[in-house]
Amino acid sequence: MAEERIQKIMSEQGLCSRRAAEQIIAEGRVKVNGHPVKVGDKMDPNRDVLHVDDERIYIQKNQQMYYLALYKPRGYVTTASDELGRKTVMELVADIPARLYPVGRLDKDSEGLLLMTNDGAFAQAVTHPSGGISKLYRVTVQPRADEAQILKLSSGVVLDDGTKTMPCAINVVTDEPGRTVMEMTLKEGKNREIRRMCEAVGLEVIRLKRNAEGVVKLGMLQPGKYRELTKAEVTGLRAAAAKGRAQTRSAALQSKAAARRPRGPVGGNKASAGKKHK
């Protein structure tokens, strides 16, 4: 077998996404034949020996791919393991005979739809920012959100680290004294983004539930349970990610073209610039 990039092999073996593999390699946690490797290095899966965090990884060929929709309950962390001993989502899919990992994340206090897979290329496509796959959340905040706060959230707010969020769609479900329940549709995935957005406008999130990601709906799935995605759902997510990447590339090219376009003389037409109007 020909040599392949190590981060590609790691993602295909279900260790993590390709981006996460690059980070792990950069941290010096990966060795091939006993030697540390760099991002971009290659190995022969048939000949070379791979270790991650000093654990040998036995490379499986032609393994079955799994694509799951999991209802992550509150109280579980979205990691493969946790140094603090907290419950992880891996415990909820322990019966799957493959090394799965989460596609994206939900913080410990949030609940709802979480995709899981052992297909690194799929995870990379779905989570990459250029894909722009929409995610639907049901968010309960306190105190009651007024029109100005909702307008700020939908228009994009500046977070505590100085970055500004993209505009998002908001639909108020219930509005009563002391609290508001709304549906928010986002196309980006900053860390704890919705909670930080609400904090920026003076609101506290008391419940956050993801109900959909692209074509995949949480539906009647119960907390802690999972189901396999249909072929149509897997295809739909891939198609949405590809469309998003194409739109991102097109926008970037248009922006570059506009930046290169020659500008006219400052002040308009030089011939008429000195004329006095009576």
Residue ranges and their predicted role:
Residues 1-278:
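Basic, flexible Lys/Arg- and Gly-enriched helix-loop patches that mediate nucleic-acid binding at interfaces
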